[in-house]
Amino acid sequence: MVIYALDASAILRYLDGEAGAELIKQIIKGHLAGKHRVVVSAIHWGEVAGIVCKRHGRGGMDAALSRLSAFGFEIVAVTANRAVNSALIKVERKIPYADAFGVDLAGDSAEHVLVTADFDVKAAEEDVRIEFLPPKPKH
């Protein structure tokens, strides 16, 4: 069974209705139908919370997290081992630390696929399966 690891950029694209939101909707529908699973690193969950709170205030954040929680995504805790693995990924692949948690999560099995709009993780493409969302249109 495919396990989609959504990072903060993928979730924000969904919430904002931006490029790639339709793909995320399809992934969520498949998850709800039991066709595949969706996991999110606690780091990315917190990143979504912070960005939504900054944009829309505490009430907006609470509403968005409630909406997302209803989907039943598995929020994967940050353990000491994951923190160290992510640090190694950051150093070896020269990607931002928070993004490294998505790469680490996608490395849990061959069934995992990282879904992201963040092209900083391209350096890890040879290590894990990554599905990149389309770039935002330039205005």
Range-by-range predicted roles:
Residues 1-40, 53-66, 136-139:
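Short, well-structured N-terminal submotif of metal-dependent ribonuclease cores
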